[in-house]
Amino acid sequence: VSLWNGKVSFEDQYVDDIFPLVRSAKLKINKKEIDTPLLWLGHLPSLEPHLWNHFDVETVMVSAYEIIRNRRVYNEVCEKGIHKYLGFDGLIIMDSGGFSFQKKDELDVDPEDILELYEMSKPDLGVVLDHPLNPLEDEMKNKERWLKTLQNSDLMLKNGKIPLIPVVHGYSLEDLKKSCDDIKNIHENPPIIGLGSIVPLIFKCRGSKKFKNSVNFIIDSVRMVRKEFPDSLLHVFGIGSTKSMHLMYSLGVDSLDSMGWRLKAAYGCIQLPGVGDRYPVNKNNGRPSLTESDKELLSVCECPICEDKSLEERIRLLDSDFKSRAIHNAWVFICERDLYHQKLLDGSCFDFCNERLKTGFFSKHFSYALQEVVHQRLDSVNI
């Protein structure tokens, strides 16, 4: 597909000794260069905060859906281009908004309309208009969604004017393998491949009969896509927390996006390194509030909201103001990504992930991931 030529390249720089699929690499897009693993902070184009006005941000994701639904924003983005509209000179992915269209039960979105928006707004990368699967739908409806995604992929990859990311989906390893094969028939070796339909598995399928362990299925799915596209950067869509971020990175995911920093702030939560969601003030409603050890972490936070303030001032501001929580949360997300990258390069990635994931919801899933690593190593020795 000629639209990729000379615009995007992805080259391995470092592979971890313990996790066979984990790597750091260089991604080059439109003469911009960045180290993986990546974290794209989701941003709503017409709303504050603009995080890059508060601290250094390299990568942002916006949604075509959010732009199309607001005519004023659409016109301005198309006139100025998305970088100038946002006042941001880093890398921007524009997602097609397939997940949002799914929630509205809209399957008749015209991929050519999305292509036109991409061409006029000029993000660094676009995403093929995909129709994510729904784990609660019947199999035929999900097959219909994949066929529409495949049709869109063929049309958009052949006619797009900017680099586009194809996305694979599947709620069984057999279906996911077929999805990978279908995309390879269009583009055998895309520089970037996306894995979608992950978010509904986490939030809709806990305890379901079909997915007795949805997170372990996600782990297996990530491994399959990495093996099917070993030379492609792997992006997984819609990761919510820093702990899920570390789990995905430890599996060999090269790139993630998250709106979690904003959504958690909207619910009144803040993030802290290595800790789950916390509410700044204990309101006796059963929600997890700051412990004494959490307060110690908060007292040394250097985010733009917390710096130069007493602990009491930090707690009061984070409890009362959404924007302050959002900026603080995004800072923690970025710092956790940067720390992971540092640990990867100095050879302590395993110890770091083990520390971050040893407690909480993802601890047993990290153990499952480690068991699979051991099995892979034994198989390679036997061969």
Set out the residue ranges of the language-model regions:
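C-terminal extensions of enzymes
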Residues: 1-30, 34-43, 133, 297-383
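Short, structured secondary-structure boundary patches
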Residues: 148-150, 275-282, 373-374
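Residue-level preference for long, well-ordered alpha-helices that form the structural scaffold
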Residues: 107, 138-149, 172, 207-214, ...
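Surface-exposed alpha-helical segments enriched in charged/polar residues
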Residues: 116-119, 151-154, 158, 181, ...
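Non-catalytic, usually N-terminal nucleic-acid engagement modules in DNA/RNA processing proteins
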Residues: 1-160, 382-383
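Glycine-rich phosphate/ribose-binding loops and adjacent secondary-structure elements
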Residues: 2-4, 159-312
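Short, solvent-exposed loop/turn segments at secondary-structure junctions
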Residues: 41-42, 66-68, 98-100, 132-134, ...
